[in-house]
């Protein structure tokens, strides 16, 4: 079906190209890249599977800055720490906009959110609000008990499976953990994990995430938007939005109900509705703005932490010496403390574990291709022209393997590199940018880190793991599932064994 659609796109685009093409008045010296076909550009050369590795392969051939074309759009990919710094620091303002994306526009209530909003005065106001209120250290700390409570529930499930020598699905457990935490933090709602409301929430979430990761023909072939309709993509987008909007509106209505029993800790939607009532911004802050911002929190919060822990455990299965070293540190510290559960406060006393978290985010950044930026004005990078309107991707996966920064073995999973070198993910070390950098850096970085540390550390404390059914580490599938966050394409399943906790 996809091949047929591509064929129709090509035919329709060729006809419309000759009807509407205008002569270019300016020639640019674009970065090198593969030769494009007429009209459709490099569309047929792209790969869906493991796009970060695919673009890294192109970078080896064409260099750390390359360009390609899809339809009417010029695309640029950055794959080195040096050029990432040029883009994200030196020329940050000029690359602070977002490119066209029909799904992003529709799902985010006309880009009223933080992540997908154009670079406008409203964006700057809403980002400042997010940094100072939604994601401040104080706000993140208020939900510490929620994250720890849900992590305990997750460990209890694994304990029961270990008693029966059953296989556990780490991917599924982590998604359940993040979904439960996010519902409590964002909405003040504690759902039964197997109940209908949680199933409804997950269905809505997956639909929204799916639309955000889709490619729309109309974004690249302006005269072929009808193909989004013919393929059913437009209808699917509207259906997902309808479910999403109905759910969030119900939560908003509950928040406004004066008879409602408020959660013990103010939820994020309570905070946002307070801002809606106060109207502190120069731009109007509507209910749709509330919905869009809460959507950012839900989508980012559920996806990234789960993917990170799964990738971490995957690499630990392939590097048993790292696993043993991490387990030894966590277990020795907790034995000395006399506790059987790692809290967020304990993590700061576990230097090797903190290095392990960083190495996990380095070797498999969960958003390996940072959310695309758009060039606002004509500029140059590395001597090449970058025209206004160009879409620019930073391949964080390739940047974190830049041999100039990480040495000759960047594919080796080695947490020690973060004990030997002072590098952090706060956006100022451009060889390590899992949360991005600059004006578009993820404002929820602190919350994202907190979401993954406690479950990750307690897996190391409480259990030994082995692969099921005689699998060997080399048998583990390392492919990624395409989307906003790159999950493993196949769930990670392990056999837990209880550890004697002194």
Curated annotation (Swiss-Prot):
Positions that bind heme: 442
InterPro entries recorded: Cyt_P450, Cyt_P450_CS, Cyt_P450_E_grp-I, Cyt_P450_sf
Localisation per UniProt entry: Endoplasmic reticulum membrane
GO biological process, alphabetically ordered: glucosinolate biosynthetic process; response to insect
Deletion phenotype: Reduced levels of all aliphatic glucosinolates and increased levels of indole-derived glucosinolates in leaves.
One example GO MF annotation: oxidoreductase activity, acting on paired donors, with incorporation or reduction of molecular oxygen, NAD(P)H as one donor, and incorporation of one atom of oxygen
Function, in words: Involved in the metabolism of aliphatic and aromatic oximes. Involved in the biosynthesis of both short-chain and long-chain aliphatic glucosinolates.
Name of the protein in its database record: Cytochrome P450 83A1
Gene name of this polypeptide: CYP83A1
